[in-house]
Amino acid sequence: FGRLLSVRRSQTRGKEGPYLLFLLTNSRKCMRREGYIIEEIVEYSNMSEAFEAVLRGTDRKESIQGKKLLAHREEVISKLTAAIENGSFQLGGYHETEIKEYGKSRILQILSMHDRIAVYAVMNVVDRHLQKRYIRTTGASIKRRGTHDLMHCIRTDLQKDPEGTLYAYKFDIRRFYDNVQQDFVMWCFRRIFKDERLLVLLERFVTMLPEGISFGLRSSQGAGNLLLSVFLDHYLKDKYGVR
């Protein structure tokens, strides 16, 4: 059957259970854990970038929240920096709205802009460290990747090895965010990071909802990619040589 081309993937989800427990207990690949991540997060340049990113666009700047934040920009950055640095930052709640995307209805959790600045600052650094661990064809929510980049990779493989790419397995994971098991996500984060202050913050993001991970929280994009990277991508590539 030649080489299997794994085409991935819209972030929807399927069943955990015994299969993932098997992967969890049989994971043999050791990773060197990284520390001192909080120090990178609280650098002024990163906190300032997070502030600007969350308040981009006229509508956000002209909103009640936006005007208040802009009027106290340096104070907001200073307080959020301190809260992240000492590990005391807590999400202050959210409201929900229903959106339709690709023919599906989804419930989106929306944080205050204030909290989004902190989450953005944390994940801006965390994502940079996580992306080094992903396989080349991980593309969801990653700058300069995505659908077009993945299509280029597929076309290149098809041209270089027509016989080896004769067969492919395309699949989807149903309701990914809704059904993710939070303890699996945190196990993955702990496998990569040893900074306890960071892990406390990440756990607060992951457990914001009673079950699953938030569809509207930026951290969920990285958490989803990481979960699939550990339990699917590297498992298939490292154990079975799937290309």
Describe each model-derived feature in a short phrase:
Residues 17, 22, 33-38, 119, ...:
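Active-site-proximal segment of RNA-dependent polymerases
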Residues 89-96, 129-135, 197-201:
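Short, flexible active-site-proximal loops enriched in glycine and acidic residues
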Residues 105-135, 210-238:
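Conserved pre-motif C helix in the palm subdomain of viral-like polymerases
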Residues 54-67, 99-109, 135-137:
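Glycine-/proline-rich flexible loop or hinge segments
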Residues 83, 156-243:
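Conserved polymerase palm-domain catalytic core
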Residues 73-104:
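Active-site-flanking structural segment that lines cofactor/substrate pockets
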Residues 1-78:
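Non-catalytic, polymerase-adjacent accessory regions of viral genome-replication enzymes
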